[in-house]
Regions:
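GST-like domain detector, emphasizing the conserved glutathione-binding G-site
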Residues: 1-118, 132
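Short, solvent-exposed turn/loop segments enriched in Gly/Ser/Thr/Pro and often Arg
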Residues: 9-11, 148, 193-194
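Short Asp/Glu-rich motifs
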Residues: 14-17, 179, 199-200
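Compositionally biased, intrinsically disordered low-complexity segments enriched
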Residues: 56, 185-186, 191, 198
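GST-like fold's C-terminal all-alpha helical module
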Residues: 73, 86-185, 189
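Acidic/histidine-enriched, glycine/proline-rich intrinsically disordered or flexible terminal extensions
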Residues: 193-206
Length: 206
């Protein structure tokens, strides 16, 4: 289950939760599932007949419908600023991070490339430096309060930090991560190492 969806649901309030099925992702290759999501990918939600797929779309929907005050201060301007960071994370940070996951965790050793790892590390670091500069004078990415914009960035940053790769000093990002850690959803679903790198802890993600 993508952390964006789990964390957003955990943040909507005490009754906000996401059911996580077992047999990891095996249910996606069925006619019933494909009728909801023709891509056969996760996640997909059916909220009273509102069927949605793609993590960021679902997070934005959950925030607007169930927790606008909690997740973007009820402000359309703040929502738009948060959304721009969600989109930016998806296209600017995640491709290089995905390459790191493949070449450090998922591919057989014979298929891993040290050159790809280093190039991807440098690309992520460049984005982190941009993020660190953005946080000057701002507690979070869309302003002074936690929003949906911090969710994908927090997930990606935490995962990169767990890799233990070389990085420059990023004091504002470290303070921002500490602030994210004040949220129980972040502590439960994002901070633990096993949520990102199960092979290093002897566990797997659901």
């Amino acid at each position: 289950m993508p952390y964006e969806l789990t964390l957003a649901s955990a943040t909507t309030g005490e009754k906000g939760y996401v059911w996580q099925g077992e047999v990891p992702f095996g249910i996606v290759d069925t006619a019933a599932y494909r009728s909801m999501n023709p891509n056969g990918t996760i996640p997909t939600i059916d909220d009273g007949g509102c069927i949605l797929w793609e993590s960021n779309a679902i997070v934005a929907y959950l925030a607007r419908r169930y927790a606008p005050d909690r997740l973007f201060g009820g402000s359309e301007i703040t929502f738009a600023r948060a959304l721009q960071w969600m989109i930016w994370a998806n296209y600017s940070v995640d491709p290089a991070l995905h390459a790191l996951i493949l070449h450090l965790e998922r591919l057989p050793a014979s298929q891993r490339s040290a050159e790809t790892v280093e190039a991807s590390r440098q690309e992520v670091v460049r984005k982190l430096e941009l993020m660190d500069a953005r946080l000057e004078g701002s507690a979070f990415f869309a302003g002074d309060a936690f929003t949906i914009g911090d969710i994908p960035l927090g997930i990606s940053t935490q995962r990169f930090f767990h890799f233990g790769l070389e990085r420059p000093a990023l004091p504002r990002i470290e303070r921002w991560l500490a602030r994210l850690g004040e949220h129980s959803g972040f502590r439960a679903h994002v901070a633990p190492l096993e949520k990102h790198l199960p092979s290093r802890t002897g566990t797997r993600t659901a």
